[in-house]
């Protein structure tokens, strides 16, 4: 049996470092928090090679006396608490006295510090051992330089991400700290280039502008609320300014950034149903009695125990709701918007031109079925007056079609006998084009959940849909038949599958049709997002987004893919947001993600189909990569055999 023995101080420091110092961003966090606790009003962070080579944090705080330097690098030595009572009444960001000892255990550290006297102190540590200490000259404050992180624990280096990812983590933590302390001027520089600078004038909205961009700051609403235990102040975005993840929500408790799902959910509850499944940009600063907060539950202190959490949640929800109500009251009661042609709202639209050279992406189900094929090369953007005249003529024509459809529509449409007088012609060239566009491997997702009334044959045949005979439709669902089996088709999911297949095929073949802009559009980003997107410009070009770096956290867009529909700036912003929030790293997975989101955005509502439109939908599903579901896994087709129908009606029992 092995004997119990006491571990060396250096080994215990390395063990502690494993909990506290995970990556370069952890070093930055600990040193900046120490500077804040030292009452600094200016803090400068400089990193080289994403902090892997060197990290420097300089402040104008109180400094450390010469005879206290050794103690500062000893484990569990601190000036922030004195006894057990202080442990439950913590008013500082740090309190354990582990940070400097943990950093010095896994890196080379040099400190230059002064309390404002005539003599400053310079000292160096490596592997937890002091190398030297000497007098020096310096203004009041402290500068700590950390180099060669994990030099003596190379196994830790294997778990670090790419330099770009490590830099983004540093940017993120500095952003959060800056939002929690608008009274402090914070500067972050990487390899000599300034990424962030806040003025330190206490103006939170100005810090939001510096971090997320001026346009975001202009759409932020002030939230305020308080009760006997908590004081809440912050900024939340208008309901129409959203992101696809919670990453833009910062909750700061007594100046400390924390992660708390319940408080985040309380924030979302304040928006009601206005977010549409997305998330706002928000900064909530909460002041609470330290006795209500237990910080000593997590090595990085990002998770805390909070008394009266439900009361605080209600406070947050009511504050956000009130801010949004004030915004609604300030908005115009009535707004004039362009009136759309009724056929664009009530009828599915086509752009199927089999006899025309495909110079642009066919906008599936988005143009009128009666539309005459346009000349080759004609773009979606036309002369306004000409478009209006054309739309009026088409509107009249389509109304007549709808009337005829209601009075003379057959009971079903045989897919093999679609007539030319339906004003829709299928040709071999178009059929071949569809096959080429949609010949993709099966959807790489999980197994589809089996329907209670779906036989095993469905699962075996789900990658192949037979030629169906249309029976009818009801409220956006199609009913069809083949071989005595009944097929139920959700037209939205089916259209999304076809849209997904076509967009993905274009992306993978790099055959995007683009719409150029007379003047480029400017997109502002946070420092974090800007740094991430700069490296993805080649991928954006593959997606059909021609963008270039414009500096100052902005990108210029010169053209966009024609499969983006709706308001261009909104659609592009949502697409970029999806890329930023995605955890996918390989290009193919990102292309699938973009295609799926674009299909979901482009096809969002059920409409009544004409017989020809329904026939075409079923025909094209035969060549889909997975006709039985859309890219998100939503069921598109359900097959009921005669045996299934008998079971439903309990026949034979």
Swiss-Prot record:
Pfam families: DNA_mis_repair, HATPase_c_3, MutL_C. Residues 368-412 are annotated as: Disordered. One of its GO terms (cellular component) is mismatch repair complex. It comes from the Bacteria. The keyword Nucleus does not apply. Coiled coil: none annotated. Keywords: DNA damage, DNA repair. One of its GO terms (biological process) is mismatch repair. GO terms for molecular function: ATP binding; ATP hydrolysis activity; ATP-dependent DNA damage sensor activity; mismatched DNA binding. Residues 375-408 have a biased composition (Basic and acidic residues). InterPro entries: DNA_mismatch_repair_CS (IPR014762), DNA_mismatch_repair_MutL (IPR020667), DNA_mismatch_S5_2-like (IPR013507), HATPase_C_sf (IPR036890), MutL/Mlh/PMS (IPR002099), MutL/Mlh/Pms-like (IPR038973), MutL_C (IPR014790), MutL_C_dimsub (IPR042120). The keyword DNA damage applies. HAMAP family: DNA_mis_repair (MF_00149). This protein is involved in the repair of mismatches in DNA. It is required for dam-dependent methyl-directed DNA mismatch repair. May act as a 'molecular matchmaker', a protein that promotes the formation of a stable complex between two or more DNA-binding proteins in an ATP-dependent manner without itself being part of a final effector complex. This is DNA mismatch repair protein MutL. It comes from Lactobacillus delbrueckii subsp. bulgaricus (strain ATCC BAA-365 / Lb-18). The gene is mutL.
């Amino acid at each position: 049996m092995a004997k119990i023995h006491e571990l060396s101080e250096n080994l215990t420091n390395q063990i502690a470092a494993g909990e506290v110092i995970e990556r370069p961003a952890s070093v930055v966090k600990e040193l900046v928090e120490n500077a804040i606790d030292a009452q600094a009003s200016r803090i400068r962070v400089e990193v080289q090679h994403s902090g892997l080579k060197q990290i420097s944090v300089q402040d104008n705080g109180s400094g450390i006396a010469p005879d206290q330097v050794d103690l500062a690098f000893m484990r569990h030595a601190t000036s922030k608490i004195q006894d057990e009572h202080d442990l439950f009444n913590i008013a500082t960001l740090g309190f354990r006295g582990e940070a400097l000892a943990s950093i010095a255990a896994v890196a080379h550290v040099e400190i230059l510090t002064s309390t404002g006297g005539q003599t400053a102190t310079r000292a160096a540590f490596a592997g937890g051992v002091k190398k030297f200490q000497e007098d020096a000259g310096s203004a009041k404050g402290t500068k700590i330089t950390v180099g060669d992180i994990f030099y003596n624990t190379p196994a830790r280096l294997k778990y670090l991400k790419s330099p770009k990812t490590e830099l983004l983590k540093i940017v993120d933590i500095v952003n959060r700290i800056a939002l929690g302390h608008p009274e402090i001027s914070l500067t972050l520089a990487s390899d000599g280039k300034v990424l962030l600078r806040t003025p330190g004038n206490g103006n939170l909205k100005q810090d939001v502008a510096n971090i997320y961009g001026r346009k975001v700051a202009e759409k932020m609403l002030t939230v305020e609320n308080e009760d006997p235990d908590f004081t809440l102040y912050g900024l939340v975005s208008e309901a129409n300014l959203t992101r696809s993840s919670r990453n833009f929500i910062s909750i700061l408790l007594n100046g400390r950034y924390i992660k708390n799902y319940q408080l985040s959910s309380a924030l979302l509850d304040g928006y009601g149903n206005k977010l549409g499944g997305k998330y706002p940009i928000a900064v909530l600063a909460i002041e609470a009695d330290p006795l209500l907060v237990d910080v000593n539950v997590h090595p990085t202190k990002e998770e805390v125990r909070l008394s009266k959490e439900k009361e605080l949640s209600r406070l947050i929800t009511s504050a956000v709701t009130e801010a949004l109500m004030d915004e609604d009251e300030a908005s115009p009661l009535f707004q004039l918007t362009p009136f759309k042609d009724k056929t664009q709202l009530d009828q599915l639209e086509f752009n199927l031109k089999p006899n025309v050279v495909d110079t642009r992406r066919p906008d599936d189900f988005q143009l009128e079925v009666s539309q005459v094929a346009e000349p080759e090369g004609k773009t979606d953007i036309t002369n306004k007056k000409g478009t209006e005249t054309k739309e009026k003529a088409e509107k009249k024509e389509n109304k007549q079609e709808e009337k005829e459809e209601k009075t003379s529509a057959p009971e079903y449409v045989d897919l093999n006998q679609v007539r030319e007088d339906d004003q829709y012609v299928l040709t071999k060239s178009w059929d071949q084009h569809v096959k080429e566009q949609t010949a993709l491997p099966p959807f790489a997702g999980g197994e589809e959940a089996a329907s209670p009334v779906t036989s095993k044959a469905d699962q075996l045949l789900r990658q192949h849909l037979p030629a169906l005979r249309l029976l009818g439709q009801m409220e956006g669902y199609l009913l069809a038949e083949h071989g005595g089996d009944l097929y139920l088709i959700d037209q939205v999911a089916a259209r999304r599958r076809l849209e997904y297949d076509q967009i993905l095929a274009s992306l993978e073949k790099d055959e995007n049709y683009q719409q150029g802009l007379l003047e480029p559009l400017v997109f502002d980003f946070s420092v974090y997002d800007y740094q991430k997107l700069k490296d993805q410009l080649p991928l954006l070009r593959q997606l059909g987004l021609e963008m270039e770096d414009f500096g100052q956290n902005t990108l210029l867009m010169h053209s966009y893919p024609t499969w983006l529909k709706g308001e261009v700036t909104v659609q592009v912003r949502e697409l970029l947001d999806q890329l930023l929030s995605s955890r996918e790293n390989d290009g193919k997975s990102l292309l699938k993600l973009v295609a799926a989101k674009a299909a979901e955005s482009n096809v969002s509502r059920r409409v009544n189909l004409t017989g020809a439109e329904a026939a075409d939908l079923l025909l094209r599903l035969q060549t889909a990569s997975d006709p039985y579901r859309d890219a998100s896994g939503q069921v598109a087709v359900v097959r009921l055999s005669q045996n299934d129908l008998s079971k439903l009606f309990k026949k034979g029992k």
